[in-house]
Regions:
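Beta-strand/loop substructures that line and gate deep hydrophobic ligand-binding cavities in soluble
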Residues: 81-135
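Hydrophobic ligand-binding cavity/cleft-lining segments
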Residues: 1-42
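Short, surface-exposed coil-to-beta transition loops
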Residues: 3-5, 62-66, 88-92
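Generic structural detector for well-ordered beta-strands
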Residues: 7-11, 38, 68, 94, ...
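Amphipathic alpha-helical segments that line or abut small-molecule/effector binding pockets
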Residues: 15-18, 134, 138
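Glycine-rich portal/gate segments that line the openings of hydrophobic small-molecule binding cavities
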Residues: 38-86, 104, 116, 135-148
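A short, compositionally biased micro-patch
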Residues: 11, 72-73, 98
Length: 148
């Protein structure tokens, strides 16, 4: 299945957009359903192999999921791949600096189902993500442009 890809122009520098879009402690500010998140870094600053933990409210419970950072090239590219749970996300964030000092943000998202997730991903999860992703990046844009 093709990734869900959304893009948006943000009137902030690439550095600001990248820092905000890849900080799991800020995900709850712009991603529907996220209630918390943090990085588990080995050396204080993010690097490939570190763990990104985000907690989403699903159904009647808060469920953490862990991803590994697979690419980290600030302020241009960040990728994570889910490593636990029945639904594992693969996320690629790309930020391009524009000549006017704004930034073009692209987020590509794919899911891999394990166990029950094999049924949920094509039936429910992908459809919901296609609906939410444009709203999420619009919220990110509004938050960055309105509060900085």
């Amino acid at each position: 299945m093709a990734p869900i890809t959304v893009s948006i122009e943000v009137n902030r520098s690439a550095e600001e957009v990248f820092a905000y879009a890849t900080d799991p402690s800020r995900f709850s500010e712009w991603q529907k359903g996220v209630v918390g998140g943090h990085m588990e870094s080995r050396g204080g600053t993010t690097q490939v192999g570190d763990r990104c933990v985000s907690t989403r409210h699903i159904g009647f419970a808060d469920r953490p999921s862990t991803s590994r950072v697979t690419d980290f090239d600030p302020p241009h590219h960040w990728s994570v791949r889910g490593v636990d749970g029945p639904i594992r996300a693969m996320v690629d964030v790309t930020v391009e600096e524009r000549p006017d000092s704004s930034a073009h943000l692209t987020i590509a998202l794919e899911f891999e189902g394990h166990g029950l997730g094999r049924i949920l991903v094509p039936v429910l999860v992908t459809r919901e993500a296609r609906r939410e992703m444009p709203l999420n990046v619009a919220a990110l844009k509004k938050r960055l442009e309105g509060s900085m």
